[in-house]
Amino acid sequence: MTISPPEREIKTVKIVVDRDPVPTSFEKWAKPGHFSRTLAKGPATTTWVWDLHADAHDFDSHTTDLEDISRKVFSAHFGQLGVIFIWLSGMYFHGARFSNYEAWLSDPTHIKPSAQVVWPIVGQEILNGDVGGGFQGVQITSGFFQLWRGSGITSELQLYSTAIGALICAGLMFFAGWWHYHKAAPKLEWFQNVESMMNHHLAGLLGLGSLAWAGHQIHIALPVNTLLDAGVDPKEIPLPHEFMLNRALMAELYPSFAKGLTPFFTFNWTEYSDFLTFRGGLNPVTGGLWLTDMAHHHLAIAVLFLVAGHQYRTNWGIGHSMKEILEAHKGPFTGEGHKGLYEILTTSWHAQLAINLALMGSLSIIVSHHMYSMPPYPYLATDYGTQLSLFTHHMWIGGFCICGAAAHAAIFMVRDYDPATNYNNVLDRVLRHRDAIISHLNWVCIFLGFHSFGLYIHNDTMSALGRPQDMFSDTAIQLQPIFAQFVQHTHALAPELTAPTAAGSTSASWGGDIVAVGGKIAMMPISLGTSDFMVHHIHAFTIHVTVLILLKGVLFARSSRLIPDKANLGFRFPCDGPGRGGTCQVSAWDHVFLGLFWMYNSISIVIFHFSWKMQSDVWGSVTGNGVSHITGGNFAQSANTINGWLRDFLWAQSSQVIQSYGSALSAYGLIFLGAHFIWAFSLMFLFSGRGYWQELIESIVWAHNKLKVAPAIQPRALSITQGRAVGVAHYLLGGIATTWSFFLARIIAVG
């Protein structure tokens, strides 16, 4: 018989960190390009500074050691969190120091939020508009005031305290970033321990995070908001800790608090239905979701994720193994199925990032649609500028994330994909029939483009010929979105069957009554007609084109019929030489570049649609004479022609930004002008011949040489790729800032 040595029986704790792997030194900060042998030599030409920007964060190009790359990314995440905490601290500090928050809290329907007062240097104080309550400042549309009220903040002191707390958290994050790279750096196996990661992220971040938030909502936000809704002066409301310590205070508002935890342990949970509700609809006082519904929601989410955080097998031999789940996942048409994907996701952070960006981008777009249909914060729905800003912001974020997903998926294909370990699995099979996928997608784009645009062209032509009876419209040839109307109707009626005790459906947009706060419409049923049907198909068209470009970039990142050895050329390259009908602009990077323009098209039309539709059919006022909308319901009549969009939306609604000079909105007029310039400047880089600029530079250098003032660093024109990068950056920046100023000047003036 074999006797195991005693040391083997003692369970040793796994060491998952390396101690002091990288000495701390500031010397590298003084050496630009220290991460690359070529760049570290210093600049020979002006291209050096562009290469520096392109590669500074490309950790893959600094080293091939996956462990070191993982540590750098991990450490950088703490830096990112630190920056976020500093930014948040600044927001809360502005609320505490420069805002009219306390005044707004006492009368949120008449006073507008402001947290910035412009200093008078040479007349800039004109920007300090009268926001009501005797306060002069810039009206803000970030939604922070509504968020603060919803979370139960009643004084500027509380905002100060939170701002200081956020700075402390920022310090902790920066320290953690340094510590986990220089002092205790995790080993690669720690980064690859997916079961443990899933358990911690699900149970810790999402489960305990939601539970903590539910606790805050129940114990602090609920009593504060209940008293505020009842009209109690914020200064009279007890301090947050008093609600925690004095149960009698809570019991006055929510009687079940007097019973303590007895109903919980006796499974008599319905006792708690005074503060954990399932009402549906909006609070008529604030126009926001019921806070008791949201507390209930977060508690339920917490339970779900705490359970989910115990699903995966770690130290105890029970639970799921991610590798086993993936490898068991085989369909009738997917060959080896998901075999090999586990290896991809534990060795390629680009693959992991691509999936996460696609999901986060989609989630951001879903958030933007819920911000208006189910406004979560008090008095958010009646603050039209904030509603428009939040929708637009989350749409842009979503679009950028989805383009980023394609970028990193393509980088994965070029740098990390191993054909040998992906034989006949789902990824291999997708790649093998990529021609069918792309050609079908191409056909769909052509079909959608011609048919959707064709409807508009038809209408513009009939309109010009004076034949309104032959147009597609709600009053002539109707193209009603019957499926969307069916979905609306079903959701409006659903609670009668699925939640008989609920007071309303999930959103007032489905149907039912108008929710108005102080005579201003918060939300109401949104009627859909021919104009919506038409623009919906433009959305479908632009989204499919964006997907076509991005997906083609990913599926052909390694090889194509034109360039079979594309993987050897890398993620970005300008051309593969002359001939073959042209080999320029085929790199995966170029597909992301082109995809960004179509993403911009897609999002622009979505936010234009939203802005006009809401002003026409939702936003406005309710008086004794009935409902009056900002643009009087003109969406249905005008949005079915291109001319209608140009005349009744872009032109008619830009008057506020164009005529803003000399008013508190004049900054938007200047931004509108300046952003148009930035956008136009981008075209110089996009419609550009590189040789032209190089030739121009040569003659300028010749003149400098003649005068003996030639620089030591040789000037060079931007490379094709660099020029396109500068071009797309300015195109998007200029376009977004133009749209932003146009939207805000309009909605602040009329909303």
Swiss-Prot record:
Binding site for chlorophyll a': 676
Chief place where the protein resides: plastid
GO CC terms of this entry: chloroplast thylakoid membrane; photosystem I
SUPFAM superfamilies, per the entry: Photosystem I subunits PsaA/PsaB
Manner of cofactor binding, per the entry note: P700 is a chlorophyll a/chlorophyll a' dimer, A0 is one or more chlorophyll a, A1 is one or both phylloquinones and FX is a shared 4Fe-4S iron-sulfur center.
Subcellular location: Plastid, Chloroplast thylakoid membrane
Protein name: Photosystem I P700 chlorophyll a apoprotein A1
Summary of the function given for this chain in its UniProt record: PsaA and PsaB bind P700, the primary electron donor of photosystem I (PSI), as well as the electron acceptors A0, A1 and FX. PSI is a plastocyanin/cytochrome c6-ferredoxin oxidoreductase, converting photonic excitation into a charge separation, which transfers an electron from the donor P700 chlorophyll pair to the spectroscopically characterized acceptors A0, A1, FX, FA and FB in turn. Oxidized P700 is reduced on the lumenal side of the thylakoid membrane by plastocyanin or cytochrome c6.
Topology term for the membrane: Multi-pass membrane protein
Swiss-Prot/TrEMBL catalytic activity: reduced [plastocyanin] + hnu + oxidized [2Fe-2S]-[ferredoxin] = oxidized [plastocyanin] + reduced [2Fe-2S]-[ferredoxin]
A Pfam entry, by short name: PsaA_PsaB
EC number annotated for this UniProt entry: 1.97.1.12
A GO molecular function held by the record: 4 iron, 4 sulfur cluster binding
Domain of life, source organism: Eukaryota
PANTHER family named in the record: OUTER MEMBRANE PROTEIN, OMPA-RELATED, PHOTOSYSTEM I P700 CHLOROPHYLL A APOPROTEIN A1-RELATED
